[in-house]
Amino acid sequence: DLFVRWRIEELFFSNWFNHKKYVHKSTLDSFFSQQHPWTYSLKGKKILVVHPFSETIESQYKNKKKKLFKNSEVLPEFASLQTIKAVQSIAGNPVGFDTWFDALDWMKSEIDKKDFDIALLGCGAYALPLAAHIKRMGKKAVHMGGVLQFLFGITCKRYEENDEFKPYINEYFVYPDAKDRPKNAFAVEGGCYW
């Protein structure tokens, strides 16, 4: 296990984590600005992405992966890319499941059907339980959160207003496709993902 440290409040729990390996969140999130990013370790691997923007991610990887970043190590050639469209139980939208746990179980069952080496997760509150499920399968998972969309050249309000990200956005970046955008999307965190 590798823990990502982010907040000062983690000091209160440090005695529980002192035997674990950890990195700071900036190491995980700033892959696009590093000379040798951690994402290069995905080269040649079978990658599964669980994210609400599955269709946009597939399109960007298939059509523009070599144009998104000047550093080709940021988004390397995978052996394969598969996606699962994460359930978005947000903004009052119906999701087709009676409970949050039913949606989680459905995503677990979809993951069980896939052949992959590493899963990249950007699926909100579902990510940690899914990562635990993937670990129990004997596979690896990386919970990237919101920055996962940036790896595939998908921009949004959050990145266009952030001076750290702005220099890396080029003409090949896109907004999430309409098929990947829920109704009332802009009611969620001020529309920062869209």
Give the positions of each predicted feature.
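C-terminal functional extensions of proteins
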Residues: P129-W194
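Gly/Ser/Thr-rich loops at beta-strand to alpha-helix junctions
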Residues: P52-T56, L120-P129, G145-Q149
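A short, acidic, amphipathic alpha-helical segment used as a generic capping/interface helix at domain edges
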Residues: D102-D115, Y126-L128
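Glycine-rich phosphate-binding "P-loop"
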Residues: W16-H24, Q82-W106
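A general structural motif
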Residues: G44, D115-F116
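Electropositive, gly/pro-rich neighborhoods at or near active sites that engage anionic ligands
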Residues: D1-E77
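Hydrophobic/aromatic beta-strand patches that form the interior of the parallel beta-sheet core
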Residues: L48, Q82-I84, L120, V142
